[in-house]
Amino acid sequence: MMHDDPNEAGLPPHDDAIPDEAAEGADAVNPLHHRRIRSFVTRAGRVSTGQRRAMDELGPRFVVPYAPELPDWNAVFGRSAPRILEIGFGMGASTAEIAANRPGDDFLGVEVHEPGVGALLKLIGEQDLSNIRIIQHDAVEVLEHMLAPESLDGVHIFFPDPWHKARHHKRRLIQPPLVAHLVSRLKPGAYIHCATDWQNYAEQMLEVLGAEPTLENTAADYAPRPDYRPVTKFERRGLRLGHGVWDLVFRKRAA
């Protein structure tokens, strides 16, 4: 789940409120990691009437139920097109804007936060978007079971939970085992684009992505924000206050 603007990305993280024992329990054993890394933290949130209506009316078409098997994604989207995975789309405003501006690409958004799913479905209906599909499930399991090797043209991970306390850094999403698994799902030449407003997390992302031998950085270190990534209201406000935002864009080396 994106962590930043409540209007853009659901509720912000509150790892001050997560006891160590509870956080430990959230990290069940997984083949990807010695300690389970989830792509989300479950948070309470109210689904609005409009979001619920969108879920009821548009969910059957645009929400893909999780199943531990490979779907026929061309059939799911109704065409064969470049496919971009987004992990944690928050309230979906950026996802919808990117999809609207890139109609030739298909976008698979993975998010567990129900109000966020409803909000993106509402935007899909309002903007008549056909190139988005949603899975409401843990992205790690989606990667493991629903995406074939070398099937993705890109991955977007924008403003993931920073887990800012040092003792919680091990719960951050961008870690070597997950990155290796992501890379296995990328076609040669495909990209991973991450963004964060936490400098410490940006430094970790740069180190982890840079250490993956099958990836190459498209910049000397941090990349200029690509034109396709919208600037959120929260981000714009932070920039006015002098806060930093760091984008990283890496590509998978050709075989």
From Swiss-Prot:
Q: Which residues form a coiled coil?
A: none
Pathway of this protein?
tRNA modification; N(7)-methylguanine-tRNA biosynthesis
Task: Report any Pfam family annotated for this entry.
Answer: Methyltransf_4
Active-site annotation? D161
Q: Which residues make up the binding site for S-adenosyl-L-methionine?
A: E86, E111, D138, D161
Q: Which reaction does it catalyse?
A: guanosine(46) in tRNA + S-adenosyl-L-methionine = N(7)-methylguanosine(46) in tRNA + S-adenosyl-L-homocysteine
Q: Does the keyword S-adenosyl-L-methionine apply?
A: yes
* EC code: 2.1.1.33
Asked if the keyword Transferase belongs to this entry, the reply reads yes
| Gene Ontology terms, MF aspect | tRNA (guanine(46)-N7)-methyltransferase activity
Query: Which top EC class applies here?
Result: transferase
User: Which residues take part in binding substrate?
Assistant: K165, D197, T232, K233, F234, E235
Q: Which PROSITE patterns match?
A: SAM_MT_TRMB (PS51625)
The protein's UniProt keywords, in alphabetical order, are: Methyltransferase, S-adenosyl-L-methionine, Transferase, tRNA processing
InterPro entries cross-referenced by the UniProt entry: SAM-dependent_MTases_sf, tRNA_(Gua-N-7)_MeTrfase_Trmb, tRNA_methyltr_TrmB_bact
What this protein is reported to do is described as: Catalyzes the formation of N(7)-methylguanine at position 46 (m7G46) in tRNA.
Instruction: Give the family, as the similarity comment puts it.
Output: Belongs to the class I-like SAM-binding methyltransferase superfamily. TrmB family.
Can you say what this protein is called?
A: tRNA (guanine-N(7)-)-methyltransferase
What gene does this protein come from?
Answer: trmB
